[in-house]
Amino acid sequence: MFTNRSLDTFSTGCRFTLAIGTIAFSPIAVGHGFGQRYDLPVPLLLWVIGAGLTVVVSFVMVGVFSGGCKTLGSYPRVNLLKASLMRGLAHWLPLAVIRTIAVILLIATVLAGFFGNQDPFYNLAPVMVWVVWWVGIAFVCALVGDLWALINPFRTLFVWAEWIIGRLMNGRQLSTVRPYPLALSMWPAVAGLLIFFWAELIWSAGSVPKNIAVAIVIYSVVTWSGMVVYGRDVWLQNADAFSIVFGILARFAPLELRLVNGKALIRTCTSPACRSKSLDCVNGYHCLTKAESEHREWNLRPPALGLVNDQQVTFSMMVLVIVLLATVTFDGLLETRLWTHILDRTLTSEIRWVGSVALVLFASAF
């Protein structure tokens, strides 16, 4: 008769063997943006039904296995800051160097967009925005941790501006720090995400370097204006589409930043990461930037456990996640024969309008 321990050992061995076999015998995978197009050897309808059932079954399993969990924050974790090497990496000097490099890359991207070769294949801006930033940062956030919150150059430039103004004007703050309206919730982020995906998927001139540079400047003005009115981290964690999306992806990651024994600070925080008010603050950078070093942890945790928490999900955040999922699916729809047939029956001058309406309708129906 098998014991629970022997069954666990057997199960672990099977999973390990399966993983090794998958790696050893899988064919070479080619990146989506650089490889040849691959058509599925199954009918599109069958693929769509299978994908839909996968989503439904996933939600059912999450509801079944996490519904009875009472200690959502009590998963195993290791504080990496207990190691001297990790404390050195988390020192202000390495962080300042990394953030400065990010600022330099941002400035170089904008200058290349305005003054460089306008051929997208010979300009830095399209590669930096669509490949290195949007795809690369997303993968790092999901597989490692919230890198964007660490290196965000727009936040860094605002911090520098705050420091300069404070020195020149006897400690005067750049932000007015007005209370963030509850009615706004995450709707600015939803609107920003829709505009971004429209530029990526529908706008035919979205790869033109000068247009990318103009878009970065417009985004900078909007972001810095929000920081001035409502505060730096309050705006980023409530209204900035990219900070929120990368933060959601970071919930899959094995690394987290945690504020412990700081409930007095958590009670006054307006960050979505702290709205539960009952557990330690995880990846709530509004709290972490104000906390003392002894209350901060840089933890290694099992992957994807950041998804399991008792944080109240607002309706606007639910819509944002749906828009994120819908637009990724819509990107695949643009490569199907159905969409090609629609474009064949559309006037050239109307293609952008047809695509825009289809994007909104698809996200609404999703």
Where do the protein language model's features map onto the residues?
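Long, well-ordered mid-to-C-terminal structural blocks that present hydrophobic/aromatic surfaces
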Residues: 333-366
